[in-house]
Design a protein with these regions (language model features):
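N-terminal alpha-helical interaction blocks
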Residues: 2-140
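Cys/His-clustered metal-coordination modules, chiefly Zn-binding fingers
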Residues: 136-251
Length: 254
């Protein structure tokens, strides 16, 4: 019987999702147990007025000391095989500050080239993402914000790092911080609204199934792919790490 070969990115995605199992479980546990402080009514009122719902750093601080959660995620990275026991211990006793790692994530610090420091940053991001996802879910558990028209996330004010192509001409944007999603009909740069080449450059990466979409005018980039077949956004971002590194090497930002 003839068989259909799956695209390489489909196989890579499913394999990585399986390998990331311990990390995804740690993320789900943090998401379920955390209790971020959010004035839900006030946040909803702000969003209706076109303003960002809450102060993300204040919400993170309301969740207490991030170190125990960070240690749990590092444990998960070790179980998953991304980190040795010695490196995990070294990171836990290093001078790296979890709050600084999260703040760097907020302000667009470059992804570390060193693999161990990159895992440390990823672990801090997993924690921060879980806490902000929980906060955003309190405001609106619906999947997609359909009436939001700004570039930044309606909930936490983060910029999108992923764009999912929908049927037709629209795209769904995904917040790099809290994974909230909102629609846009615009096909070019979200910042300067340019749509034409060569200002807009698109590089396809068949191995991961993403296009790296770069604006040479304002220096922003997005990772874009069809919506179908996506995994957890933690897995999606891990899959596309090399695209982030390539964009950052060019001096671009999300």
């Amino acid at each position: 019987m003839p068989t259909l070969d799956l695209p390489r990115h489909t196989t890579v995605r499913s394999t990585l999702a399986e390998q990331y199992g311990p990390v995804l479980r740690a993320h789900a546990e943090i998401l379920a147990e955390c209790m971020p402080l959010v004035d839900v009514d006030h946040a909803r009122s702000r969003i209706r007025k076109g303003q960002v719902g809450y102060d993300a750093l204040r919400v993170l601080r309301s969740c207490g000391d991030p170190m125990p959660r960070y240690a749990r995620v590092l444990d998960a990275f070790e179980v998953a095989g991304f980190l040795s026991n010695d490196d995990r211990r070294s990171l836990l006793h290093s001078e790296l500050d979890v709050d600084d790692l999260v703040s760097g994530w907020f302000t667009g610090d470059r992804t570390p080239r060193d693999s161990t420091r990159r895992i440390a940053r990823q672990a801090a991001i997993v924690v921060g993402n879980a806490l902000l996802r929980a906060a955003s879910a309190l405001i609106e558990p619906a999947t997609v914000w359909r009436e939001w028209t700004r570039i930044v996330c309606p909930c936490c004010g983060g910029f999108p790092d992923i764009a999912l192509r929908e049927r037709g001409a629209g795209r769904t944007l995904v917040c790099a911080r809290c994974d909230s999603q909102w629609r846009t009909a615009h096909q070019g740069c979200l910042s300067c609204r340019t749509v034409d080449e060569p200002t807009i450059a698109r590089i396809a990466n068949a191995d991961v199934g993403y296009d790296l979409v770069m604006c040479n005018g304002c220096g922003r980039f997005l990772k874009e792919r069809p919506r179908r077949g996506i995994e957890s956004f933690i897995v999606e971002r891990a899959l596309a790490t090399e695209l982030d590194l390539a964009a950052e090497h060019r001096g671009l930002r999300i």
